[in-house]
Structure formats: C-alpha cells, structure tokens
Regions:
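Membrane-proximal helix-turn-helix segments that form the acceptor-binding/catalytic region
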Residues: 83-116
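Short hydrophobic beta-strand element within catalytic cores of glycosyltransferases
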Residues: 259-262
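Aromatic "clamp/platform" in nucleotide-sugar-dependent glycosyltransferases that forms part
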Residues: 242
C-alpha cells in the first residue's frame, strides 16, 4: 500500500479516486503498513501521526486553517510522545483560548511532519506564524462531481421574485446575522434562505423576527437534492464569513451559475478574483448596496470563466497532490 489516507468525511477524500487512477494504492481504512500517512484534516492528525510512528513511514498533514480566536496570543500545551502516542500536559495559564489540546497536538505533529500543505496563502502564513513551520500552498477543490456546472442543473422558477441564499455551518464567524441586517435595509426585502446546522440557528430566527425579515432556516443539514434545488431557485448567493481557510460555498455557487456576493477576506480574493461582488464583512449597508445592484440586473445567470473553476476541480487537485505524494514515497517526480 502506498498511502494510508486519513479523512473525517467524504469531502476530504475527494481526490482519492483520481489519485488511484494515477497509479497510487490508497487505503481509507486499514492498519496495513503504507509508504506514507496523510492526514487530510486536523481531526485526523493524531491518528495519522500515531500510525506513522507505528509503521515508521513519512507523515504529511493538510492544515485547512488556524482560526485566530482559537489560538490568539496564547501558547501551546506541552505535547510529548510516549510509545508513539501523543500525550499533552495542559498549561495552567497563557494557553490557546479554545481547543488548546487539539491545536497543541496539531502543532507538535506539524513540527514533526515530513510535509505540511495548506489550501491558501493565508493559511500558509498562519502556520508559519503560530507553528513555526514552513508549509506549502496546495489548493484543494470544490466538489466538481456534485456541482458539475449550471448546464447540468437548469434554473428553476423561483418561489418568490427575490431570494437570497447562504449555505454553511451556523456559527458566529460565518456571520449570517449580517445578511439579515442587510436584507432589512432593502426597499423590497428578499426571502432569506439559510441552509446549515449549528448553535446560531435560534439567534438568527429571533433576529429575523425582530427585523421583520422573511427567513427560511430549517436548521438541519440539507440533502444534495435540496441544496441543488436551493441554488437553482435563488436570485443570489451570499457568503458573509469573517474567516475562511479556503471557502467552498462561493465556488459551488459559481459552478451553479449564480451571482455571488462574498465577504472581502483574503481567501475569497485569492480564489474568486473578479468573478464575484465583495463587501466589507462587518458592513451591512455595504452588503445591502451590493444586493440592490444584483437585484437590479436581468435574471440571466452570469457566465463564469472556466479559467477560474478549472484549477479547483477534483482532477486538478489530484494533479497538484500527486508530485508531493510521490516525492514522499521516494519515487521520482
């Protein structure tokens, strides 16, 4: 076996079939010895690290992001290796503000790893700043099999003339409250539809009622069919996050042919270029102006240049990962 690929979900394993077609033998679940252990997400770092120690093989980590509110100015807990297992001694003070054990173990593994890869320039810089590790930028992908293009999913008749869609976890940094405040500013407020699950759901419902904004928020993860239907019916997709390591939702929206308005943060600029409208992530008046501009345009779907999405497909991601994987396996590039 070439690679033992550690992934917490289907998304983080998207490039595996293409890499197998390229000749790599990859296992998603196995204790058999492999030439390389690869953690495709922070949730798998400890398991991949300990596997690499047991089987004495190289280790590669994919670090998606390092949220500033979780690490802040704090210091990592002390992490030790005992018999190939990571053990942690918590600091009594000045530690990382949130999930100290998780990020302390990740830092230790990154400093021991043979390679650390990140999806964006922003994350590369954060890894060097917080972990003291030189990482390589290797962008991941959106699910180009699931969102193959607008021509595969023709637009449905909208249930109301103006509808605004947002798709993500319902947590504070995703910034959905800004959407509601912006919608309340419009002379003809749209239906706001938010698909996702998380602790902010009830707060958003209360805010929408206070602002008299029509909100459709099921509060549970939607099926693929429901998400495709929501994209087809929406007038615009809004991605208001204050922080991202990569940013999947706007890529999905562009692939589905939707107008997209995104927060002006570095990863959005890095991958979306001039294909979307931007707004300051704490300025609801700015977002309201961008919404008015989109709603004033004809309803036809915008054309997205293939040059923007093609480098971020599953196959393109596999092509980027392959040289690094083969190098760590000791093969000629």
């Amino acid at each position: 076996m070439d690679v033992r690929w550690f992934s917490p979900n289907r998304y983080c394993a998207l490039p595996v079939p293409a890499l197998r077609r390229a000749g790599l033998e990859i296992a998603l679940e196995s204790e058999q010895s492999a030439g390389l252990a690869f953690a495709a997400d922070g949730a798998c770092v400890a398991a991949a690290f300990e596997y690499s120690r047991r089987h004495r093989c190289p280790l590669a980590l994919y670090v998606w992001d390092l949220p500033p509110w979780r690490l802040g100015p704090g210091k990592p807990d002390r992490v030790f290796e005992v018999g190939g297992t990571l053990l942690r001694l918590p600091r009594l003070r000045d530690r990382y503000p949130e999930r100290a054990g998780y990020y302390s173990r990740m830092r230790h593994a990154a400093r021991c790893a043979d390679a650390v890869w990140c999806p964006s320039t922003n994350t590369v810089e954060d890894v060097e700043r917080h972990f003291g590790v030189r990482a390589e930028r290797i962008p991941f992908c959106y699910d180009s099999d699931r969102f193959p293009g607008a021509e595969q999913f023709p637009r449905s008749a909208p249930r109301c003339p103006l509808s605004l869609l947002s798709v993500s976890r319902l947590v504070p940094h995703k910034n959905h409250a800004l959407i509601l405040r912006a919608a309340a500013r419009l002379s003809a407020p749209p239906l706001v539809r938010i698909l996702g699950e998380g602790p902010e759901a009830e707060n958003l419902r209360v805010l929408a009622a206070t602002l008299s904004v029509r909100l459709e928020l099921p509060g549970v993860w939607a099926s693929d069919e429901a998400i495709h239907a929501a994209y087809r019916e929406a007038s615009v997709l809004v991605c208001p996050s204050r922080f991202e390591g990569f940013g999947l939702t706007p890529l999905e929206g562009l692939a589905m042919g939707l107008p997209v308005i995104a927060s002006d943060i570095p990863p959005h600029r890095e991958f979306l270029g001039e294909a979307v409208r931007y707004f300051a992530p704490d300025d609801d008046a700015n977002l309201a102006r961008e919404l008015e501009a989109v709603f004033a345009q004809p309803s036809g779907r915008p054309a997205v240049l293939p040059s923007l999405l093609a480098p971020l497909t599953i196959s393109a991601c596999a092509d980027r990962l392959l040289p690094g994987l083969t190098r760590l396996l000791g093969r000629a590039p």
